[in-house]
Swiss-Prot record:
The lineage of its organism: Bacteria, Pseudomonadati, Pseudomonadota, Gammaproteobacteria, Moraxellales. It holds the Pfam family PGI. Gene3D superfamilies: 1.10.1390.10, Glucose-6-phosphate isomerase like protein, domain 1 (3.40.50.10490). It is found in: Cytoplasm. CDD domains: SIS_PGI_1 (cd05015), SIS_PGI_2 (cd05016). Belongs to the GPI family. Keywords: Cytoplasm, Gluconeogenesis, Glycolysis, Isomerase. InterPro entries: G6P_Isomerase, G6P_Isomerase_C, Phosphoglucose_isomerase_CS, SIS_dom_sf, SIS_PGI_1, SIS_PGI_2. This is Glucose-6-phosphate isomerase. Signal peptide: none annotated. GO terms for cellular component: cytosol. Its EC number is 5.3.1.9.
Length: 555
């Protein structure tokens, strides 16, 4: 279906009677301890499952009446129609007049989707075929560097969505790696990452992937330029040419083939993106080449299949059982109505170490907006500040604030039920995994119930008169349990959060697919950089001018 010209104006949740009901409900003094005491079926009713993902949201500060109002709020803004518009290629990115078809990147070959008279599914699978061919050449050792040696290391140069997604996924799925080719990631513009990495790599056996949708991102291109210089310095000593270095040591991934060619990427090593793929939603595309190299194309296809299964759940499940809808509505309830303006993601699994950073970009860059799609200034809270860390590490870092600070913070606990199943039972590794699961459940319990959670097991601590030992509880949280971390379940988990973002944006009536807030800083950086190269006074504010003067004096 081609619906890009559909400029439908949807009903606004802001003007719904359910918005006012939720505002009134938010004035109540919510007590999680009381909610659980009043209803022994609460957990069964306030939980849902899709495939390998089980979600318990019973520790959120809401009841049946609030949940019903949230579901009605979703209907009031025509969320079902908005979901179909997203999936069918409507112009949901209104400011840039584009579709946002990241879900098309994981459609099976049997699907049918047309956009501007172009067969999207055929184009996607043609690109996946190219990803498979290039990745297998690297994995099999048939891709050779300028000196004829097989590639041993691949460096993905990108930033934002061109870095965080592949980095997060390859780290999470590293135990599925079935190749001796190592994959590395470089994003920092100051060169520190790249400089430290190159000291340990062999120029003759290193392949670089330059990932940039525009192929104009200064962070990425400055690192790519340094990488090329490093390669050429060695190639000249080995009678290699610049052409052989560019042909054998660089792959480009971008929506701008002209810029790739101008930089020197050979056409057969260019992978195309589409304008309807946003950077933070792009790991399913050719941007995922590094993932395919590391875990193989079969694993990458399983990642796509897992995401597609969540797409189908999102499109078909009743809202009351729909994980992305529920997760998004709860986030709106917390941020907009309860004014819980901080949210933390706490995976109790070291393989998910980069998930919090990935979700920080996904949510804050998507929904950190203060203007509606129609240009109206927003008078309600939207996206909360989001951060996170591996749960066991966070316990020794910022859990003190969660338990006894003055800020209310909502939490997502994430854990994998099965791990080390290939080991004999009760091994030290399995014991460690059980300990991690126990900590996950324990922390969510104490955050919810505070001292009341301890009273049942240690009355002395619970009744201690020392106020500095008091746990107030009542911190809202959701717990996501994954049967087992696999490419399929990881794909479903990531898609769950993608769709959560869209649900929130639909309620808030904002565009989650642009990021105009990052543009002015880039433009100003160019002006500041020019001023660094010039003599005399800079034309900025006194603070910036003084800082520039100090830098010049020390340079």
């Amino acid at each position: 279906m081609n619906d890009t010209k559909d400029n439908k104006v949807y009903s606004s949740a802001r003007h719904s009677k359910y918005w006012q009901k939720l505002k009134a409900a938010a004035e109540s003094k919510w007590s999680l301890a009381a909610l659980f005491a009043q209803d022994n079926t609460r957990t069964q009713r306030f939980s849902a499952q899709s495939g390998a993902l089980y979600m318990d949201y019973s520790k959120q500060c809401l009841d049946d009446t609030v949940l019903e109002s949230l579901l009605n709020l979703a209907n009031s803004c025509e969320l079902s129609a908005r979901i179909q518009a997203l999936l069918q290629g409507a112009m949901v990115n209104t400011s840039e007049e584009r579709a946002a078809l990241h879900t098309a990147l994981r459609l099976p070959t049997t699907a049918n989707l047309q956009l501007d008279n172009q067969d999207v599914v055929a184009d996607v699978h043609q690109s996946l075929g190219q990803v498979e061919r290039l990745s297998e050449r690297v994995r099999s050792g048939t891709w050779r560097g300028f000196s004829g040696k097989a590639i041993t290391d691949v460096v993905n140069i990108g930033v934002g969505g061109s870095d965080l997604g592949p980095l997060m996924a390859t780290t999470a799925l590293d135990e599925w790696a079935d190749t001796c080719v190592e994959v590395h990631f470089v994003s920092n513009m100051d060169g520190t990452q790249l400089d430290n990495l190159l000291k340990h790599l062999n120029p003759e056996t290193t392949l670089f992937i330059i990932s940039s949708k525009s192929f104009g991102t200064i962070d990425t291109l400055s690192n790519a330029k340094t990488a090329l210089s490093w390669l050429l310095a060695t190639a000249k000593l080995r009678a290699g040419t610049e052409d052989s270095v560019l042909r054998r040591h660089f792959i480009g991934i971008s929506a701008n083939s002209e810029k790739m060619s101008a930089w020197g990427i050979h056409p057969e090593h260019q992978l195309q993106l589409w304008e309807w793929v946003g950077g933070r939603f792009s790991l399913w595309s050719a941007i995922g080449l590094a993932i395919a190299i590391r875990i193989g194309m079969s694993g990458f296809k399983e990642l796509l299949a897992g995401a597609h299964s969540m797409d189908e759940h999102f499109a078909q499940a009743d809202f009351a059982e729909n994980l992305p809808v529920l997760l998004g509505l709860i986030a709106v309830w917390n941020s907009t109505f309860l004014q819980v303006n901080a949210h933390t993601v706490l995976p109790y699994d070291g393989r998910l170490s980069y998930l919090p950073s990935y979700l920080t970009q996904l949510e804050m860059e998507s929904n950190g907006k203060s203007v509606t799609q129609h240009g109206d200034r927003i008078d309600y809270d939207t996206c909360p500040i989001l951060w996170g860390e591996i749960g066991s590490n966070a316990q020794h870092a910022f859990y003190q604030l969660l338990h006894q600070g003055t800020q209310q913070v909502s939490c997502d606990f994430i854990a994998c039920v099965r791990r080390y199943s290939d080991k004999a039972k009760n091994t030290p590794l399995q014991q460690q995994h059980e300990l991690s699961l126990a900590n996950c459940l324990a922390q969510s319990r104490v955050l919810a119930f505070g001292n009341a959670a301890i009273a049942e097991t240690d009355s002395q601590i619970a009744c201690d008169a020392d106020k500095y030992k008091y746990y107030r509880g009542n911190q809202p949280s959701t717990t996501l349990l994954i049967d087992e971390l696999t490419p399929h379940s990881l794909g479903a988990l990531i898609a769950l959060y993608e769709h959560k973002v869209y649900v929130m944006a639909s309620i808030w009536d904002i565009n989650p697919f642009d990021q105009w807030g990052v543009e002015m800083g880039k433009q100003m950086a160019e002006s500041v950089h020019d001023a660094m190269q010039q003599e005399g006074n800079a034309p900025f504010d006194t603070s910036t001018n003084q800082l520039l003067k100090h830098i010049k004096q020390l340079s």
